[in-house]
Amino acid sequence: AFAAENEETLVGFCVLGGIFSEGIDLKNDRLIGAVVVGTGLPMVCNERELFRGFFDERNNHGFDYAYLYNGMNKVQQAAGRVIRTMEDRGAILLLDERFLQRQYTELFPREWYPHEVVDIRRMQELLQAFWNEGNKGK
């Protein structure tokens, strides 16, 4: 259960598009990172396929309008929980190879640049260096 005044390490899990990924405001060091697993693409359904077909006929971007933009909006909302004020500091990890595709990277907010693609060992090194740098003045 979530405790408002938790003094210990807390790991929270949420679903993209759920209330935690969109409606919680944890400032300062209350939330120091987000690990986003998957691209947030909505399920295929008749309504979305009609929407996709409509935009494919108009501009050949039906997948983008029906699925991609919706999914990336969820990803950005979840990642946005980490940085709420100018004083906040945190790490955002995107775990899905599809995030390497241009159609996804073009939708990254400017604050996500520069970003780096790493393996698990390099990720551990970078996160340690990131937190060591942030704790120098404390």
Language model features with spans:
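ASCE RecA-like P-loop NTPase motor cores
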Residues: 1-138
